[in-house]
Amino acid sequence: TIQEVENADAILLIGSNPRWEAAVLNARIRKAYIDNNCKIGLIGPKLDLTYNYQHLSESLDYLNELSNNNSDFNKVLDKAKNPLIIVGTSSINSNFGTSILETSAMLAKKIQKNKDINPLNILHQDISRVGALEINFYNKYVENDYSKQ
């Protein structure tokens, strides 16, 4: 939930610009950065955010480095007590969206510390999509069941 962002001590942003896509979320990330010394990593283009972050790569392929424990940011995620992954819908809607979502889900499962809090978050750009998902209006053709991961 958005409240959990304030408790995060490590956040991985994947293909997302929370400053423009979700200003309230960005304010919560900034609060975590200031209050919790939250470490933030970004995969995607360099951005002008309101807090410091470690730019990991412009390429979404870097997600494979993280899933294979070949990144320095893995140490940050492993040490974190409340890690979060925030995936932007623009990366999911790309040609490699299914792979990005699968890899993000696997990484989230690896770093999950609290069984009550799922570290994987999808930042939707359209509130109407969230409403549609809540009433189970979505494409039934999915290769994997992410709720079981």
Language model features with spans:
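Catalytic alpha/large subunits of respiratory electron-transfer oxidoreductases
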Residues: 1-149
